[in-house]
């Protein structure tokens, strides 16, 4: 999918009328098959940008097109079909607590299924080997038949990412996928996503707080601050000076000072859920 934003601004639906837009005057082009990381301090507008790209939040000014089409000018059914071509992984995966992991992972295929097939898959998983392989890429194969509510926060986050590997989507939008993972798990998870997206020719846009991981795995880096574009560069051209300016007064985020309480997991803080529909 090719994404284009022209002087785009967007405001959160719950924001006060006088509040500044969460993102403003953004001009970006993301080509089909690109892998792009979006970085910046807290409150920079990263999640809002993903909401716009997910066709979940209409722009308040400017234009947004997907493959040269404006999503918000499409008929409702056509908009639903377009949303079915993208995969959105929010910070907190919306996994039913009593569901088996195998069912949760195979839910990544639901957009390509009919109603009857979707309902049947809730009780009779259709492709257990595929679910096993996807989980194995994230070192979770042993959790295949575990219940979701028995997983740790980091394991649930990786189950949410494993869904992407089974999704038929050509656009993957991943919001802070590493918030519950330690550095080793983080690098493994991002490496798996980037490599798989590249193999399939899928467009991947991920928001990240872990700048070192973004620079190591993504060929293109977009920096946001205060809702505006700070830079859009190949990763090799993102200098320390640019990062220092981007994270001015937020140096602790640039240093990655996130408390980790156990191998593979974070302190358990729960980020805000982002819904796409």
Please describe what each predicted stretch is.
Residues 54:
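Helix-to-loop junction immediately C-terminal to a conserved catalytic motif
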Residues 147-151, 155:
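Conserved ABC ATPase signature
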Residues 208-209:
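H-loop/switch region of ABC-family ATPase nucleotide-binding domains
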Residues 71-87, 117-124:
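ABC ATPase NBD coupling module
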Residues 172-175:
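Catalytic Walker B motif of ABC-type/P-loop ATPase nucleotide-binding domains
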Residues 62-70:
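Conserved ABC transporter NBD signature motif
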